[in-house]
Each structure stands twice: as structure tokens, then as C-alpha cells.
């Protein structure tokens, strides 16, 4: 035996010797003789490889030279045998071996280098060597050119990114240090590279140290700040990265610093001086960030459709081997850079806090092992021995030496300078003192707790709060404060995770991993543990008896087989998801069920019973005992993961769609599963069971579930008629459980539970688990469950989930939230959701229900409301309310159509206005408009780009979409000046405080501003988490008093914004003012608290933020249905930024203080509302004072709060409201009252800022809102689709998918009809047209309109002449920056001659592809009106106005203005005389009555027919009390109801005008083709606004027609429209959209010769109109009035006797 062992040992020894000989024979041959220490280091780094020394003298850095020789050998082996090779930064020796020698292995070779002084000298030296002299002649010629810096076929000298040699592979031997990733990406694109193998030095210390000398590995480096001048970087372009792409890898704080320095004339960059240890030769200077990027960046995206995957393959000392490959874009790459191997740590330097000179470093980097030894030594010594520091210094000096025992190093030496040793010892002594103090405090607190009355754990929690990392917990001593704990501690260096996609600064520490619990799969090991008493197996529960099936229903299975197409449609509908993995899973499932033939399934088994009864556990135990392979199918991923923890191989668990492919594969391989278990089976359709049987016919199918829990839900709406599993229960062999082990006793004992499971018992040890808590109750240890997605979103901060998502899961404690909404009431009535909600817990159930509905449902008690002040008997009825009945009625359906984009655009232009000469995508002015303040712009850089940009669109002249592009500097500058040079109108301080007090009182009536500690802690935690997730670091946070923190970067949004009318005037874009991270971080937590209060703190106000439009519509509808006799006001703001003044600032500051915001943070917010500077890179800057910024963290919240405060204060009777930014929706019962006097700014808001719509259907954030339904606005969708331009086919396809998602439900006949009629009602056009437009949108969502069929248009083309005429050549050449001062009378110098007479060049005539521009320069005055802008087609007042030729002469303009004033005065005088004559013929009482009636009629408060001029459709109208004045003498000014009645004095108007008169009187009717009324009168009755705005709720008085009056009015109509002889009587039945009380009347287009009528006809028509307005409601009572009427009729043309019909 011993001899055999000896032989074996001899064989192994011989093999080792042979292997060592092979290694020695193939050793790396060095051309120099390395020192012994360097050779040993190389052997250790590359073990087991060997090195052979040469005969040349050693270099000054032998270890680094050895790395270089190894890299050359590896790269040359990689390049051999390849046809083409590209080498980056080649040496002549390397090129000779690969290509220059006579027998070189590479036929086609190219070297890319960037010629410099160092490389040039080395090439000259190599050219004189013997090895190069032996090369081929053509190679020697190319080498000579390279030595002189001249490019050749073999070598280029401009860098790897500037060459186009084609090769798939490349090599780089320590030559990538100054090649940025951008340049390398260009090289991959230009050369066609797919892989580059490279070597480079990467010292680990570069990650955390600036100065290193590593004698062991033979290198040293020093990080410096290298100064650079502005001329080196050409900063006038405004972007450093344009010339220095290596700066891409600096963080934001460094970037801001560099840009500030660059603006002053110089900046610095971080550079690294690298050389060998003890090397006197030339050192290398590399860019720090470029070098470090190769270590930290793993996946670098490029603009060429691919990314660079950078992988570190090997690391030997400082040398690393890289493999850089071309990879598909978008994948996330992770890598770990270990720093723990060095055993280093940072400790705070106490000398730093005491030194005033600034020479000390903040921390000391030293050995973690030595620090631990010092700390352990201090803890074992009494305090008095450590006071004089002598003992500590002696112990520390003893640790400097290495300890070697038996040639083995048991303790390494400590390389530390004497100065650092002193500082380390002193710093550790201070840390030791603090730690001892903490221990004393902890012990004292524990003693007090043990012998006191307080809880030990509660006290210890507060004492150790900050030490354990818990937030917002303060100890009883200063040593436990967060400041002390963070500052005075040892920071161990952790590993760095490289998760870099765009910036390598996004690095973090590895999270701590909790080791998983041990799982035993070995039965023998289990037996051993069981015998040893270490493992106790739970007893197998008893199995209930089997109930045999009751018959077999063949028809049911036939219907199941027929539902297979519906199931396929459900899977296909799910393919619209953006989750890549889910999409792949669904595609595989579709492939699996292709070609299946379903047959009836016999022999089904079912395990059913109450929740927690052990159904699944019993089945698992039975199957394991029987053996065999089972597949467990779960409906959700969470249930599948829970199942994985319970089963053992070879059984497996899968989700429902993945399981299908597993079954087919197992059957095809001949190893099918013996049993298939479908858990929570009632959540599946029955066709799934048939599919499982078809895929695995031999498998036994067992169903597990509870018929009383939540069943199958058709989320896609494609399988409404499919049979369910509950239909097949009686055909299964059933095992019914009736004892639960999880549910507590009080849950099982409820009437509700016993009604579902009669006689059910429980074995749970929990007796009392149910608690009814307050609505604001929070518990971080409990899982919050909600009934609807709405409530889940409201309580997202609690980690809430829906009851449906929680089915099948178990929690220790549960908070069941219920708010009493309509949707929740419906789910509660279905019982299944309530059952799941009350059976998910094992210990505690906290019911958060302020309505008491859940308690009544659990005890089966009826809900009753007792009115104590009404003496009437209590009656309970089950009849549904009338609103519910009306909502379920079916309206008239419109047959489906096959619309085309051309037809939809035709209808949109017909109904919403057409600008026939609008042949552009974006409209802008070339002149700049300044409203005040100081602005500085860069004229050269602001010159617009005249290069046409092709896009695709559905129409040549885009009508309704405003396009802004952030890359267009002209638009960006125009936006900056137009939006941020305006000023807000501040109130006196005492008036502003009064307004704030009133607005706070209004907000308090709707919101509870109480903030709990949990909510505050959660907001702070989420703010910090979000800040770090976005790459924020402590270095990014500047002090609030930093002067650079006030500089705000301005950016313009790239967007396409829809408008309901054609855009034919200059438009500016929307800007983003990007505040610093410091400012946003200070207030971010408190803003989160305010947003949470807005979402959840009110039951009468909805904060519409964060939900899709479909969900928002359902939530609004549920709230509106609770308001009886709902009436609406929809409001939007104009110039919302300027509406914010000091009142808005004081209001928001007051709310911040109310929720507990620190005073310093509130003061910082107030300061940020003051003066600041907005800077647009390369364009200019604007000084802003008081104006609102759109990029601050508080802006969205502040906008909503301010809008809500104003609207809730000015309007009375609000029962429900919804707000989102400047959009408002108010809902009242019967009426809403407006009172502008409640705020000092009320009148200004009414006349200038507020746009209000008062009607039965109002718009709100893309929705149409009525008392019955809330639906999406299909017209706005159509305007967006057919009015926008599309830049690429990819973006077009994404837009199609988005439209498909929102139009899923539009195919439903009832909803389609609803959309048609509501859209037709609101926009006043035929429902057939609405149906056509809706069907066109649906077809777009289906993808019926390919991208290739769209027209090619030119987006935003500026006319060259406009710029040249605006900015003369001498001005543009001499004046680079022009400063705009506040508005002055005189123009700035240099612009007077040009700007005095702005000319419109001939090239500005509107044509396809060219935008409308006006040529003027902002000199502090408003721009001139453009004379060539065509008016809107439906604008009646503009059509009646004669076209006035443009002139630049101010005298002509003044003369025309004087003529206009004289004409208006004469008109007023004649009108007054005529009114006095009419009034003198009436009795005084009748005079007052008729005057009052006429005023009310014209203001729209009394009902009746009134003639209005048709105008272009507008979605809203303003609060303005003045009529809109035309630019010339028109009839519209006299006949429009918006004009102020001449008979009304100021006193009478103030006495008779109701609350809504200011904006009711400014509305004009629309031109409609044919008014339409749906057949359901019960639902759509009383559509026009009621006169109940004043509080009157009665019916309208009936108005009689007068034949003579009808004849006069018909004369007026005939005079205005000769082709129209009568008004259709059907118009009186129309369902017309009105604003205020103006009626809609149908009119065709006006005649072209109407403007040519003489003055007599105009006077007669005007007089007839006045008489008609006086007589429509009141018959002529006197003969004098009749005589006047006859006199008027005699002066007009003959009029046929035709009756006039009134609108509804």
C-alpha cells in the first residue's frame, strides 16, 4: 500500500516537473535584463507564467516594461492569421513584426497615431535600429514618412477617429489613454471595427487618491489641475464639449465650475502625471476623466445605432486587458471594481478642524488592519493611561515593522509618514473618547429604562437611533447626533459598482446581501437532522373526503373550444406592453397554442375551501409522498415565487403563460409531467384548462382555489363570453375543506364569512384581530390594501397594493383602506373583494373606513341615513337613482364608416377654421420682443438655421399644432425674451396679506394640512433616495449663499402643442428654467408632503396628476355623480406666469410654514422668488424679478395651489373641484356664483388672465365633462394626429401605439355613440362628422395609415431676406452682443435707421414650407402687426373688415385712428338720439321695464332668441366686460350681443348685472351646419345654461313670436345674407353648445357684395337690429312704436312673410 502511494507521488512530481519545463520553454522573452526584484514581481503577477531576461541593459521602469512586452505578445498572437488589422498608436517595432518583415503574418495592416514630440523622437530612434533596417523597402519608406509626421498608406498621423481604413479588428498597446470614448466610437464607425483588444495601465489608487508611489508594482502618479486658456477651447459656441469631448465624464458640479471659469477666460481640467517608480525619464500626461472612463464605463451608447461594450478581461498589477466590442444599444451592463482587497479605510483628520491655514487634508487614507489594532488597544486600556498619548504612540510605532515567522509574513509593515502617524493616532484617540461616551450614555439609559416605567426597546430605539442609521431620531446626548456620527467615524472603502450608461459618476456601494435560508432537498440529510432533533417536520394535514362529479356537460366544453380565438385575442392585446420580457412570453404562448384542437376534459380534480385552509399545502404533501414530477401553475409571479419555496425538485412552478411552453416541450421530449396543478384556478378561464389538457393529454389536472374569491377578470375586453372555471365545478372530483388555519377567530365568526362558508371553524391562535382605525392611521409594519387603482395611487407612499393583487398572499398585518367611492361600493357589493381583503392577515387587520360600509357588510346590517330635523318615517328603497337609469339608456348609434385622413382633415378645417395660406409647421417672428427688465443676447448665435428639415405630415400646411425645437436657437431666444422679460403686477403688502388670508381660509375648507411624523419621515427618505438614484452626490450640494447658485440654465422644450384653431400668428415656445440641485434638494421633501396632501387630504377636491386620461376620467365621473344637479365651470389661465405675484409667493410660503418647513428653507424659497439670472447657453441671459420659473421643484405644486386658491375664493357654491396646474374644473349644485370683489386682484384676473367656460359640457385636461359622463376629447386627439409632423418612422410607430392604447374602448357601440354626441354638442357640429373623425382616430391607432404615405414637408424654414433686413451687415459684424434695456422711446444705437421702417420682403408671402415671419427688432416697443396674415375663415368680424394696406408711415396711422374715433362718436350720438325718441313714447314704468329687460336680454341672463355674428370657434371665452372692437366700420359691432347696451348706464348695469354677467355677455354663437339633438331626452334635457346662475331653479318663461318682428328680423337676415330666405324651424330643436346664454343660429357664408352696400342700408339694418332686440320678448304696445316699425319696413327692401324660429 505504501509503495503504491509512493509511486503515485512520484508520478505527480514528474508531471509537475514536465509542466514547469514547458512553462520555462515558453517563457516570455524580455529584450532587457530585469533586476531580480522586478523579475520576482513579474513572476508573482503572472503566475504560473515565467519570464526570461535578455542581454540589453534594464530600463528605468522594468516592471512597466515587462507589462508592455506581455501585452505585445498577446496582441500579436491575436492578430496573426487575420487578413486586415488596425493598430491604434503603433510603434515601428510592433508594425515591423506584424507587417513590415518579409514573412510578416498580416497582409493588410494600418497604424493610426496622433503625431507628437514624444512619438516623433521614438519613431526616429526606431528608424535607425537594426530591426527596422531589415524590413521591406515599402515599409521602410512609410516608416521614414511617419518619423517626419507625414501620413502614408501604412500610417496616418491625425488620430484613430479621422481615418477610414476598413478592418473588423484592432489592437492597442498602451495607446488609448488620450483617445476619448467619443473618438473611439467614431473609429468603430469609420473603420467598420467590431472588436478592439487593448492593454493599458490602470492603477487602482486612481479611484480614490491623488498622489501615489507604489514601489512594489513600480509606478507613481500625481493628479493635478491643468490650467487652460479660453483660446484653447473656443468657448464662444457655448459648449465646451464641442471641442473637448473628454469633458463628457465630469459630474454636473465640476461642469458648472468649468463653464464659469471658461466664461471668465480660463478653466482647468484634471490631468494625471504617470511614470515609473524611480524613473528619471519623461513622464506621461493624460486626461484624468478620459483615462478613468475605460475602467468605469461598461456600455457606452453611440449615435450610430450601436454601443461600445468595454470589458476588463484580465488584471495583472497595474496592467489590465480590455476587450472593446460593438454591441446592440440599450442593454444595461454592470461591473464591480473591488476596493476591499487593498484593506484601506478613511478616518477623519482632527487637525483639519483645528487648522486655520487650510493646509490639512480632511481625511487620512491608511490601513484598515492597523486602525483596528489601535482601536482595540485603546478599548482595553484605562482612560488615565491614554491621556498623555505616549503609550499610544509607542504602540503605533511598534506596528510599523513587519513580523516574519518561519519565512512567513504574519504581519505586514505599515507604510506611513511620521506626520500622518501622529495625526492618525490623535484622530483615533478622539474617536475612542466619543465611543466611550456613547457606551456610558447607552448603559445609563438602559438602567433608567429597566428600573423605570418606560419601555426598554422604545428608549433604546431613541438612544441608538442615529447610530443604527434610523432617520429623524435623536438620542439623549450630543454624541448620538447625526452630525457627530457622520463626521467622527472610520469610513471603510467598499466596492464600486460600475452601472454607467451616460455618466460614470453614477456609482455606489454594494448593498448588503442577506444570506438565504438553507433549503434541504436531500432526504438522507433530512433524516439525519430529524434523528438529531434539529429538524421538525410539520405533520401532514388530514385530507377531506372526495365528492364524486355530478354529470358531464358536453355543451360547456364545446363552448370552451369555440372560445379559443377569444383567448388568442386576449394574448395578442397584451402584446402592446412595453415590458420586453412579458412581450416575449406572450409571443411564445401564442406560438404554443397555434394549431391546437381542444377536446372535453374528463377526470378533473379540485381542492376548494376557505382562505388559509391548507389546500395547496395538503396537495403538495400528497404529491411528494406519491412521487413523480408535477408542474404548479400560478397566475402571478409573486405566487410562483412563493410556490418555489414550498416544492422540491423535480417538480417546478411557472406562471400561466410560461407553463404552456414548458408543457409542450416536456410532451415533445417524451417526459410529460405526471400532474399539473393550477393554483387559484378561478382566476383562469376554462379554455386554459382545455389548452393544458391538449398540450399534455396524459397529465392529471388538479384545480386549487376558492369559488368565493376574486375570479377571472377580462382586462383586455376581448373575452366577455368565455366559459369560466366556476362553470365546471360540479364535473370535478372535489375535496372541500371547511377549516382554516390562517384566518383569526373574529374573522371566521362574522356573519359575512359564515354566510359564505357555513359551519367553518379555525385553528388560528389569534382571537381578536380586527380594529377600526382613523382615516389617517399609518403603520409601517402593515401592508396596505385598497379596492381600486385610484386609492392605490393615492397611497403609493405606503406601498399599497390592490386586493386583487394580494389574492393568494399572506401578511402578518394588513390595513384595509376604503374611502366610499362609487367604484369601491360596487366592488364591496360583489363580496369577493371584501373576502380577500379580510383574509390576508394572520395577526392584525386595521380597517380604515370612515363610512362604516365594511362593518355593516361584515355584520349584514343595512345602511340607513336618519334626518333628525325632518319628522318623517324612515323608508328604505332599493330603486336605483334616476342618474343611473339615464346613464344606462342607449343612444342613437351611427353606422361605422371607413374614414381617410383627407376626409378627417376636411371636416376639421370646415368646423374649426382653415388658414388656406398657412403652409408651415411652425410660425415665428424674426424680431425679438422685450417687455421690460434687462436682457443680453448674442446676435450671431441667434441667427436662425435656414436649412430645410424634412418631416412627414398628413397635410402640406399644418394647421393646428405649434412646433418648437430646442435646437433652434432663434426660437429659444425668442421664447426667453418673450416669457421672461415680462413683469408681474405686485400688490401692496397689506393687500397681498389680506388676499392670502382669504385664500387660506378657502383652502382650509377643503384640505386638512396636518402632517404626521410618518409622512414627514417618508418624504425625507424618498427625497434622499430619488436624489441618489439620479446620480446626486454630496459634492453637488452648494451652500445657499454661493453666488453661482443664483444662475439658472434656460432651455426650451421640444414639443408640438395643439391648438383648436389655425395658428397664423407668431408663437413662442415653453421654456424650462433648470434650478440647481442644491435649491431643489432643500425644499424637495416639503414639496412631496404638499403634493401628498393635495392628493389625499381632501374629499371634495381632486389633484389630477400622475394618472392616465382614462383612469382620470373614471375618477372624475365617480365624484361628479355624487353632486346632484351638477353645473360646471371650466377655467384656464392666460399668461399664468405673470399672474403669479407677491400674493402667490406669500401664499405658498404660508403653506410651507403650516406643514412644518424649517424657517431657513422658507426664506430660501422667498429669496429664489426675487432677482435671479436666466442663462441660455450661447444665446443670452435675462434678469428675472418675481416671475415664476418652470423648472423649480416647487413650480407644479405651487401652480396648482395658487390656481385652486384663486378659484375656490372667487367662486361660491363649489361642491367638487379638480385642478392640475392652471387648469380648473368647478362643479356646483344648481349654480355657481362669482364674486371678483373677494380678492384685490379679482378684477385683474377676471379681465386679463381667466378664461372661463360655463355650460353643460366643459373641457378639462383633454377631457369633456358633463353631469352624466366624462370622456376623452376625440377632437383634440384628431387635431394632434392630423396636425403634427413626424420626424421618423420609429417615433411615428410609437405614437400609433399610444393612440391605440387610448382608443381601445372606442369600438364599443355605446361609448362610440357617447363620444359622438358629446363631441358634437361641445364643438357644435353634426354627430355624423364627429363619428367620422373618431373613426379616423381609431384607424390611425390600428396602423391603417402607413408612414410612407405621409407627405414630406419642410419644418420651420426661415426666409433669408427677413434676417438680412432685420440685422444689417455692419451691425452684425460690429455688435456681437446687444443689451436690451427696459422699454424706452428711442431705439438703441445702431438700429435706428433699420428699425424705423420695417419692411416685409417679397419672400415672406405665404407659401408651402416657409413660416410666417415679420421683420422687426425689439427696441422696447411692441412689434407691428403683420399686414399679410390672412384672417380665419370663420371669423365674421374680420371678414366684414375691409383689408387695409400696410404702411410704415406713423402719420397715416394717426390719421386713420382719428377718423375711427370721430366715426365712433358720431355713431354713439345717433344711437343715443334714437333711443331717447323711442323712450319718450313709452310710459315711465314701461320705459324702465323695457330698458332693464333689454339689458338683461343682451347680457344673456333672460332667455330668448338673439342674433349673433358667427365667429371662429373658440374653446373658451374671457371675463372681459368690453366688446371686441373691429378695425373698421362693421355691422358686427352693432349686432353682436357682446356689445354693451347703449341704454344701460353704469349704475343700471351695476344694479342689473348678475354674478356671471361679466363673462356671459362676451360670448358669440358658433356657425353650425345642422344642430343635432340625441334621442334620449331624459339624459340630455336642459343643455343650455339655466338662468339658475342667480339661484333661480324654475323653468324658462316661454317666449312668443311676433309676426311683424319676425318680418323685420328676416329683413335683416336677407340684407346680410341675400341667398338665405328663411331660418329652419328645426333649429329650435337643436342640441346647441352655448357659452353663457348666447344662442346658436345657423348661417351660411356671408355674401361677397355685402360690404359694398350704401350707408343708408347699413343704417336701416342697424336700426332694425335695435328694434328687433327691443321687441323679440315684448310685443309692440303703442301705435307710435308700430309706426316706427312700419317706417323702417318701408325704407328696406321687400321682405317675404316668413316666420323666425328661436333656438332652444
UniProtKB/Swiss-Prot annotation:
Stretches with biased composition (Low complexity): 1505-1518
Gene3D superfamilies per the UniProt record, alphabetical: P-loop containing nucleotide triphosphate hydrolases (3.40.50.300)
The EC number(s) this enzyme carries: 2.1.1.-, 2.7.7.48, 3.6.4.13
A GO term for molecular function: ATP hydrolysis activity
Main location: host cell
Disulfide bonds: none
Keywords, sorted A to Z: ATP-binding, Helicase, Host cytoplasm, Hydrolase, Nucleotide-binding, Nucleotidyltransferase, RNA-directed RNA polymerase, Transferase
Subcellular location: Host cytoplasm
Compositionally biased residues, Basic and acidic residues: 1475-1501
BP-aspect Gene Ontology terms: DNA-templated transcription; mRNA modification; RNA processing
Record's catalysed reaction(s): RNA(n) + a ribonucleoside 5'-triphosphate = RNA(n+1) + diphosphate; ATP + H2O = ADP + phosphate + H(+)
Domain (+)RNA virus helicase C-terminal positions: 738-880
Skewed-composition ranges (Polar residues): 1635-1644
Keyword check for ATP-binding: yes
Domain (+)RNA virus helicase ATP-binding: 575-737
UniProt keyword ATP-binding, yes or no: yes
Stretches assigned to the Alphavirus-like MT domain: 52-295
InterPro entries in alphabetical order: (+)RNA_virus_helicase_core_dom, Alphavirus-like_MT_dom, DNA/RNA_pol_sf, P-loop_NTPase, RNA-dep_RNA_pol_alsuvir
Listed PROSITE patterns: ALPHAVIRUS_MT, PSRV_HELICASE
GO cellular component: host cell cytoplasm
Region (Disordered): 1475-1518, 1621-1649, 1678-1704
Purpose: RNA-dependent RNA polymerase replicates the viral genome composed of 2 RNA segments, RNA1 and RNA2.
Family, similarity comment: Belongs to the ssRNA positive-strand viruses RNA-directed RNA polymerase family.
Protein name: Methyltransferase/helicase/RNA-directed RNA polymerase
Organism, as annotated: Helicoverpa armigera stunt virus
